[in-house]
């Protein structure tokens, strides 16, 4: 999982004597003569410029930005719950686009999942899988009007969860109810 991946990366960073700048937020790229020369940050609310030979934007996506979700995924996505971190707000992508970078890849798609309607707006990363509701192949899914809107048995869950998660967004109140009989146990 992500937490263990970060732990191993931090060990490598420390072993190589690289400084980690905590309590910092990147605000802009330092861009001169068609070259990214560094990054502007807010460090404990104080603006600083950090110059570097190279800059890597390892900053995540935009899933936690309602505005960017709506712009790239379409109407209705501003209200979607996020199964990941609340910190992926697209700031790094916005900085890159601002200096002329081209968006690459599929910005109009995402891995949406059935998510607990009473769960938090953003998942607790230590228990993120607890909020995902992906047992639909063993029951039926209906919307708030009592209508089925997906074929729960279309394929294995691994091949349908993102597609079905997107379908929930299109439903009244963005709700899908999973219904099971007494034979299904979790």
Label every model-predicted segment.
Residues 49-120:
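Glycine-rich loop(s) and the adjacent beta-strand/alpha-helix scaffold that form part
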Residues 13, 19, 31-33, 47-50, ...:
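Solvent-exposed alpha-helices and their adjacent loops that cap or buttress functional pockets
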Residues 4, 21, 34, 50, ...:
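Conserved active-site and cofactor/substrate-binding residues in soluble primary-metabolism enzymes
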Residues 1-47, 65-68, 114-118:
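Conserved redox-cofactor binding core of oxidoreductases
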Residues 93-95, 99-186:
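An anion/pyrophosphate-binding glycine-rich loop and adjacent beta-alpha core
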Residues 38, 49-51, 150:
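A sequence-level detector of short linear motifs
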Residues 27, 44-46, 55-57, 61-63, ...:
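Short, glycine-/Ser/Thr-/acidic-enriched flexible segments
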